[in-house]
């Protein structure tokens, strides 16, 4: 507790000092410094930067090059740093600032909505400098109630809330938000709410960039219970200190007999509008957040080296993963399994790729190792899980794991890569693997053997062979090799499975 208090006090003191400093500096120069902070922030983010990159890949696929994706993340860092400085300068921002730097579009929609006497919900996301929306509203004379999440550090949180409320906005903490927001709407006031972060297992799943995203239900409940209209609001940073604040059309609906359907409809409408703005201005949204953290939809990418046996083993693991998820309550459609054939230009560059990937050289710098079509295919993919079988794909597996911030599964013992780098390694006994927490040892090759697969294989066999009672089907089991001898126990267990 003492350490937490000390960290809180230090951060609070530093922020207070920065606030005094930036209020003395001209706005443009302050924001220039903010962009330099953003450059530093980009490198400090570390794992968050990987999350942002993976989110962008999931959302846009191959629409942007890797360099463009990194540029979007840098723009996000610039926007966050500039927004923070603008919040610190709130006490010196007045109507003159708003008139000069912020162009408001659609304010008539707020005035018309307030005439209904049921309050208004201004709904936005972590987009642009969303904090400015409440400042503009308060300076325009509206009674603003802003819902804010309580942050980790009490002193710093209290100071930031003081900045938010400096021009008259009422900051509502999430602990007592339900009752206070309802009262504000019943008084025909405005409630400002952000609703674009992961809603956990209790959230409502809506489509967002083609994936199901859990979304908090609160805003829909407020509207349905009070009849308050919901106006999506987005503030776009144009250039430097200039912004454009856009108020969109009402997305609320009249309550029906099925509240669950109503909630879904409202949240899906907002997700659609939010996606439209994020697509237009990708560098102004908060990609570093795990937006799809609790999504039921998982993408599995199976890598193929062109060898049927290797591909079959990888698909067996992918299908088993799907079966486990179905047993856990997910629908079969929630697991998307795709296959990607990896084609190197020749054996030499394949070996080169393995060597450089061990040294940590990124996938994009090694693009020359692949055929142009193969690399274009790789760039367009996204996955939560990577599965591969065979030594030629071990480096590609790890490279894609880093590219997508995904989980990696390798079948067979990696040649030169450390097995600890994989989340799961499935290795047969004859490869003599070391026993580790991420290693599963098998007696033989992985096979897709279950009741459903047997029925599928039997159906395929009947199409090609006229099976009668007089026909006998033989089973051939591979023999010994230089490094492995088939044991009687293994043969008997295989025969038990077959017969």
What residue ranges belong to the model's regions?
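Membrane-anchoring hydrophobic helices of lipid-metabolizing enzymes
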Residues: 1-124, 157-162, 168, 354
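Non-catalytic C-terminal accessory region of glycerolipid acyltransferases
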Residues: 2, 6, 71-74, 114, ...
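Active-site and donor-binding regions of nucleotide-sugar-utilizing enzymes
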Residues: 16, 20, 26, 151-152, ...
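N-terminal phosphate-binding or glycine-rich loops at protein starts, especially the Walker A/P-loop
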Residues: 32-35, 280, 298-327
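A nucleotide-sugar donor-handling region in carbohydrate enzymes
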Residues: 100-103, 419-487
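Catalytic core of membrane glycerolipid acyltransferases/transacylases, capturing the structured
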Residues: 116-175, 201-204, 331, 419
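Conserved catalytic-core segment of nucleotide-activated headgroup transferases in glycan assembly
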Residues: 118, 133, 142, 310-313, ...
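Structural motif
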Residues: 190, 299, 384-385, 424, ...
């Amino acid at each position: 507790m003492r350490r937490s208090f000390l960290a809180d006090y230090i951060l609070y003191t530093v922020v207070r000092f920065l606030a005094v400093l930036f209020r003395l500096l001209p706005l443009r120069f302050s924001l220039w410094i903010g962009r330099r902070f953003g450059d530093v922030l980009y490198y400090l983010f570390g794992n968050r930067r990987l999350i942002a990159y993976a989110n962008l890949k999931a959302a846009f696929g191959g629409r942007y090059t890797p360099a463009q994706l990194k540029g979007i993340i840098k723009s996000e860092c610039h926007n966050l740093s500039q927004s923070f400085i603008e919040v610190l300068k709130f006490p010196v921002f007045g109507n003159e600032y708003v008139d000069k730097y912020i162009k408001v579009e659609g304010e008539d929609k707020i005035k018309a909505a307030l005439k209904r006497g049921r309050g208004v919900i201004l709904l936005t996301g972590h987009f642009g400098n969303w904090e400015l929306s409440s400042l503009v509203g308060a300076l325009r004379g509206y009674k603003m109630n802003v819902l804010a999440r309580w942050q980790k550090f009490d002193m710093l949180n209290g100071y930031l809330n003081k900045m938010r409320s400096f021009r008259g906005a009422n900051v509502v903490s999430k602990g007592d938000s339900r009752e206070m927001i309802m009262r504000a709407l019943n008084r025909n006031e405005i409630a400002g709410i952000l609703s674009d972060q992961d809603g956990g297992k209790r959230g409502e799943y809506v489509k967002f960039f083609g994936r199901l995203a859990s979304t908090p239900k609160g805003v829909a409940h407020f509207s349905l219970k009070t009849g308050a209209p919901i106006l999506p609001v987005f503030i776009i940073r144009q250039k430097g200190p200039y912004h454009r604040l856009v108020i969109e059309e009402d997305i609320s609906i009249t309550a029906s007999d099925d509240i669950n359907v109503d909630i879904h409809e409202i949240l899906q409408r907002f997700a659609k509008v939010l996606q439209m703005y994020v697509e237009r201005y990708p560098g102004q949204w908060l990609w570093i957040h795990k937006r799809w953290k609790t999504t039921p939809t998982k993408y599995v990418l199976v890598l193929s080296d062109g060898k049927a046996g290797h591909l079959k083993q990888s698909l067996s693991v992918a299908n088993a993963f799907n079966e486990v998820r179905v047993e856990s309550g997910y629908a079969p459609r929630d697991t998307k399994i795709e296959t990607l054939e990896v084609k190197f230009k020749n054996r030499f560059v394949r070996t080169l790729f393995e060597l450089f990937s061990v040294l940590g050289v990124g996938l994009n710098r090694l693009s020359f190792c692949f055929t142009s079509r193969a690399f274009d295919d790789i760039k367009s993919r996204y996955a939560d899980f990577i599965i591969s079988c065979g030594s030629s794909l071990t480096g590609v597996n790890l490279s894609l794991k880093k590219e997508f911030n995904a989980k990696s599964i390798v079948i067979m013992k990696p040649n030169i890569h450390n097995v600890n780098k994989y989340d799961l390694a499935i290795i047969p006994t004859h490869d003599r693997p070391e026993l580790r927490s991420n290693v599963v040892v098998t007696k033989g090759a992985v096979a897709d053997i279950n009741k459903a697969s047997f029925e599928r294989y039997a159906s395929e066999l009947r199409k090609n062979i006229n099976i009668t009672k007089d026909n006998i089907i033989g089973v051939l089991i591979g023999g010994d090799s230089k490094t492995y001898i088939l044991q009687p126990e293994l043969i008997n267990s295989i025969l038990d499975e077959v017969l």
